[in-house]
C-alpha cells in the first residue's frame, strides 16, 4: 500500500494498530503507531528509512509491488533505531550494493544491529547535499541526541519537504496520513505525550536545532515525520509548539501521584487537593495512583504542571517501589521550572517521605515543606492536609491570590540529608514553623536561557549524557591540561561521551 504525499513522493510505510508497548515497556502506545518510510522518484529513486523489523518481509513485498528494487539509487537512513531501519537486512539482501546515506554515528548503530559492515555506507554532515535530478536536492541536517547520537533530518528542495525523523512525530495510528484529516484533540495529546516522555531531556538541543534549521531560511510545505501524521496544514504549528514546550514549559496545573498500602496516603492526597482548590479554584489538579494509572500519562501531566506532590507510604523505611521507579524516570527526564513536595503516612518510622523529598531535590525541583501523617489520618489530620494544600496553592500561584503570605523555599542547590517536614502534631506549614527548620530563602535554579556560570568547584556537567568535566583532571585527549578552568577550555571542546559542545554544559551546584 502506498499513499501519495506530494508530487513524486509516496508513503510506503507500515501502520501498527496493535502495538501497545514501545522501547521495551517504557512507553505505552495507547493509539498504536506507524513507521513512516518514503519513496522519492525523480531522475534518481530514493528510499528514506524503512520500518520496524517485525514488518520487514511485508515492507519489502509492498515495496517490490511499487518499484523494481534494483532501480533504487539511494537509501537514506535518518535514524538507525530498529523502528526506523529494522527492515534494512531484508531489503539489502536483495540489493546489497545500494548506497546508504547516513551520519557517521549511524554506521556504528546499523552495523551493531544488522552486522553487515560491508554495506556501501556514505557518511553525511550538516549542509551536505545529494542531487536527485529534476533540479532537486536532498540537504542533510545532523540532529545528534534528538534523540540518538546518529539522528539526522533530510530536506528536499523545490518540494520543500522536511523529513524530520522522530522530531515532530507522535505514536498515533490512523487510516489517514495528514494532520488535517485526523482528530485534532487526539493528535495534539499524542504530540505532547511524545515530547514529554521522549524529548524533554534534550530540550536545550531541541531549541538550538530548530533555530539552526530556521536560520537556513528554507521554505516549508510539509513536515514528514517518522511516526504518526505528515504535517501539511500549517506545518510550522508543530515547530512553534516544540519551541514552547522546550522552554521550561508549565501550565497552571498541579499533579499529585502516590502509592499506598492502606489507603492512608490516598486520603492525604484527596485532602491536599481539596485544600488547593479551596484557595485557587482555577488551578487544574490531577491525582494519580502510580500502581493503577498509565505511567506515561502521569509523566505528561508532570511535564505540563507548575508543581508536583509525590506521596508514599513507608515500607521497610523506604518509599514504595513504584514511586521510586517514577522518581527515577522523572530524574532522567530533567524537567525544568517546577516545584515539588513530598507527603505520606507511616506507622513507626516515616523514612519514605524524607527519601522522596531528597530525590525531588536531587532531580532539580524547587521543593517546599514535606508533610507526614502517622497511621490513618483522622479528622484533624485531614484538616492539616487541607491546610497544607492551601499553603501549596498560595506558594505556587501564578497569579495574585487574596491573603497570600510570603513563603520560603528549599532550593535544590544543596540537598539536605534529611528533608524537613511537618506532621499532624505540628502547625501545618506556618511561617514560624518553616523558619524554625533553619531553611533560608535562596534563588531558584537558573533557566537554560541564562548565561552559564562556573560552580565553586569548577566542575561542569553535560546536560545530555551527564559526563562531568573536572578542572583538576582536564581532558588530555583534547589537549586540555589538568588545572584548566572551564572558562579557559577552548570553544572547540566536545563532550567525550556524546560529542556535543560546551553550550550543553551546566555548573554542578
From Swiss-Prot:
Cofactor dependence:
Fe cation; FMN
The main location is cytoplasm
The UniProt record lists the Flavodoxin-like domain at 254-393
Which pathway does it operate in?
A: Nitrogen metabolism; nitric oxide reduction
Gene3D superfamilies associated with the record: 2.20.28.10, 3.40.50.360, Ribonuclease Z/Hydroxyacylglutathione hydrolase-like (3.60.15.10)
Sorted alphabetically, the keyword list is:
Cytoplasm, Electron transport, Flavoprotein, FMN, Iron, Metal-binding, Oxidoreductase, Transport
Q: Which amino acid positions bind Fe cation 3, per UniProt?
A: 462, 465, 495, 498
Q: Where does Fe cation 2 bind?
A: 83, 166, 227
Does the keyword field hold Transport? Answer: yes
Extract the CDD domains matched here.
flavodiiron_proteins_MBL-fold, rubredoxin
Q: Which Pfam families match?
A: Flavodoxin_1, ODP, Rubredoxin
Please give the residue ranges the record annotates as the region Zinc metallo-hydrolase.
30-210
GO CC aspect terms: cytoplasm
- Which HAMAP family would you find in this protein's record? NorV
Give the family this protein belongs to, as stated in its UniProt record.
In the N-terminal section; belongs to the zinc metallo-hydrolase group 3 family.
The record's PANTHER family line, in alphabetical order, gives: ANAEROBIC NITRIC OXIDE REDUCTASE FLAVORUBREDOXIN
Quote the protein name from its UniProt record.
Answer: Anaerobic nitric oxide reductase flavorubredoxin
Source organism (scientific name) = Pectobacterium atrosepticum (strain SCRI 1043 / ATCC BAA-672)
